[in-house]
Amino acid sequence: MKATQKKIIEHINLAKADGADLVVFAELAVCGYPPRDFLEFEEFISLCEDAGREIAEHCTGIACIVGLPVRNEELAGKDLYNAAYFIEDKQIKSIARKALLPNYDVFDEYRYFEPAREFACIDFKGVKIALTICEDLWNINNNPLYVSNPMDALIKENPDVMINIAASPFSYQHDDERRIVLADNAKKYNLPLLYVNQVGAQTEIIFDGGSMVFDQQGNMLDEMDYFKEQLKTYTLVGGAIEGKPTAHKPMSDIAQIHDALVMGIKDYFVKSGFSKAVLGLSGGIDSAIVCALACRALGPENVMAVLMPSKYSSDHSIKDALDLVANFGCKHEIISIAAAADAFDSMMAGAFKGLPFNLTEENIQARSRGIVVMAMSNKFGYILLNTSNKSECAVGYGTLYGDMCGAIGVIGDVYKTQIYELAHYINKDGEVIPENTIVKPPSAELRPGQKDSDSLPDYDTLDTILFQFIELKKTSKDIIAMGYEETLVRRIIKMVNGAEFKRYQTPPILRVSPKAFGSGRRMPIVGKYLA
């Protein structure tokens, strides 16, 4: 929090030097969003209050809007509000409180906050500001989630401008929805709108920034950078923000996912106090993608790739992995697991006497690799990156305490078909992921001649069915009606539900889709409902 406070004060001074009258920060900027159960600690709230007072001391010659939790002084209701200070001349002149508290997907605000029921505009230098917080502007569509709308109360005071501070998480295509909602608000209330969004990652939740300005007709006047901290100045004259309508700068879904994952890795390391990563590099496409993203996020000098061949590893897999290491310039070690796997086989020979080789021995190999990369993590202080993709996580195609171990799941919200798109995107300026890694059939290489297709349908089919079930919440009947074979659909959905116990034990997964595994998708392990 001290580092955040320092950064806020630095930007107050930068804005002041640029001649600004008012500087605006994002939702809960003082403590970061979401603070989760930190909010249950009295000391944490006191630290937020101390930070707010310290920030106020630097607001001379410039006013400030900054988000932070504030106490509910009433006896009834939750102890806190999600709120924002309006600070002028070192004084906290007013406090805006959030009314519409999201309680879906990754949001859990009713757990901590009381909704606001009273609203008032801010008067500043002859300008009346309608200040709202994130969700407060999202009750405008044809299917409202809430029974009230804070702007309907604020508009009665005849404001000159709307300001909305937000911590709106990234998922691909969500920026399009965001722009529509903001433009609709500007048009509905016939007011210019300044929207300020958080940028950065908080554990698995990624915030893409992309703050925007709209005129009263709903035309976008400016769009700040995505996945990047930025300070920009705008001028309000005669109830209008100066500027001409500008077009949105589109990014493909894959470009957005790439940039989000790079930032997610980087912020996880910075905020955890670590700088170096380790991962298992198999020569396959999943670990190649994670290695590439880690090198871009942390620098190749901070990435250790560990090749762990077994007697079932192909020569081309080892070559592909070494080619990738050479292309990125990261460090690597080659540590064979053959001796470890043989030792386990020998150790278990009595108990397994007369039983054939099966999934048990395959999992022993995967867990041997897990032991190796965890040992490297422990010995050298690396953070272990998990390399499981969303398709595998969905159907349980992975080994607990083996290839599913790690501190952060980098691609656990990226389907296998998207992984291939990411590979081509990373290679767009030149081949760094070897072509053979991309074109060869995917394989865990845990038995002779093994391919993913031995256990799973083709990934185009699998990912389509998974997307319909997980993201769109379609039932098996819905998906079968789309033309997919009934036995296959029911088998896949059964695999998804049967793998829930594994997902409870996976590392946090960087969220890039509208429905990621983790806090945004909460399913029972022992439930019998199979959709």
Functional labels for PLM-detected ranges:
Residues 1-280, 291-300, 332:
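Enzyme catalytic cores with a strong preference for nitrogen-chemistry domains
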Residues 190, 216, 244-283, 287-531:
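ATP/NTP-dependent adenylation/nucleotidyl-transfer catalytic domains that generate, transfer
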